[in-house]
Amino acid sequence: MGALTISAKYLIELGFEVQGTVDKPDIIGALFSQTEGLLGSDLDLRELQNTSRIGRIEVEVEHRGDKTVGKVYVPSNLDHYETALIAAMLETVDRVGPYNAKFQVNSIKDLRSEKRKLIIDRAKELIKLIERETIPDTKELMDKFLGEVKQGEVVSYGPEGLPAGPDVESSDTVIIVEGRADVVNLIKHGYRNVIAIEGASGGIPKTVIELSRRKTTIAFTDGDRGGEMILRELLKVADIDYIARAPPGKEVEQLTAKEIAKALRNKIPVEEYINQLSKKDRQIIEESKKQIEQAQVQPSAAPTSPQPQPESTQPTQPIQQVQVTQQTQVIEVPAQTQGQVQVTTMQQSTQQTPQLPTSVVDEINKLSGTLEAIIYDKNWTVLKRVPVRDLLDTLQQVNDAYAIVFDGVGTQRLVDAAVGKGIKMLIMTRIGNIAKVPSDMVILTFNDIINK
């Protein structure tokens, strides 16, 4: 269905069945011709459209053998009494062309109530934002009490028993801090996805290293020399995505809610932080990472005598950092047998270029500004077309999905949901905060395709 008039108050939905094969113009023509003058000139459909009190009538048609069924949508800016009269009048249409027909009202939606619901939901989100960043004077008096209460929410995580918040496992993003006191302070101010690196000897705990490989991680350290040293050790062994620092001379455990929010808001990508280091420090970090990567992919020592090898020795590809400028893997995109358009991904392939059917490219050109999403299977057949806001819920109900094209910003949460459903391609308006993506998934923007 197309876009509705912004000022419409109500939306009339009618279902219809015609005992013959007809098209949209036949349906609309019947509605106008058979209702003309029924309720007088003031409630004539054509006159109401001319004065913008009835919006553009939309029709969905489906042919089933020698019958035609579908739905009619009529946006109304009349009051609810007049809208009900118009709906009842439309039900009197009993012929379309030479065929018998039946129209019946399915629903009359109050579009303003939908808008009121959106306003209330948004207000709830804004209240949470205010409560997080604004500290009333009365709350200052209870800081000590709240701190003691919140300590009860600290859990032991991993085999090392690291101090952590209760949401570390369930959250997509994890904040890594230095000690237990830092964890307590962040939990007190509403940040429950936090873990400390203390409590384990021999350097950075393995639990933290493993978490950094499968989640988006923010290293949040003190604003002193000690915090700087811990941060560099962390970068040598862990896959950190962002860096946040306490104000100079302050420790994370001392920060107020406003200071914590500001520090996390001003976080920088790890690449930007590394570029600020001296050449020697950069080389040390890069060399440490190379050694770790080599150790992960290096096979165990070969036996002295030849051993038979299995037919396939490829390990499962690990989740890796998204690289926007280069990609060495070869990606094969299923295409229809006719009408194909070559496009180049944002990750340049060194061996072949993915292809998309022209029908998909046409849809991408039309999607901009609609806030809609289309889910395709491997044959590029449309499985679902839904509003972007319903995309995550719809994904849980769809099977055999291969690709999603949507007018929106890609997030890590969407990537994770797509991975869970075996989806291999995402095409979006813009790439947002996506830190990690499987090596067998292709991520494109509309510009990657439209500008080719």
UniProtKB/Swiss-Prot annotation:
Its cofactor is Mg(2+). GO terms for cellular component: cytoplasm; DNA-directed RNA polymerase complex; exosome (RNase complex); primosome complex. It catalyses: ssDNA + n NTP = ssDNA/pppN(pN)n-1 hybrid + (n-1) diphosphate. Mg(2+) 2 binds at D222, D224. Residues 172-248 form the Toprim domain. GO terms for biological process: DNA replication, synthesis of primer. Its EC number is 2.7.7.101. GO terms for molecular function: DNA-directed RNA polymerase activity; metal ion binding; poly(A) binding. Mg(2+) 1 binds at E178, D222. SUPFAM superfamilies: DNA primase core. Signal peptide: none annotated. Residues 294-320 have a biased composition (Low complexity). Residues 289-320 are annotated as: Disordered. RNA polymerase that catalyzes the synthesis of short RNA molecules used as primers for DNA polymerase during DNA replication. Also part of the exosome, which is a complex involved in RNA degradation. Acts as a poly(A)-binding protein that enhances the interaction between heteromeric, adenine-rich transcripts and the exosome. HAMAP family: DNA_primase_DnaG_arc (MF_00007). Forms a ternary complex with MCM helicase and DNA. Component of the archaeal exosome complex. This is DNA primase DnaG.
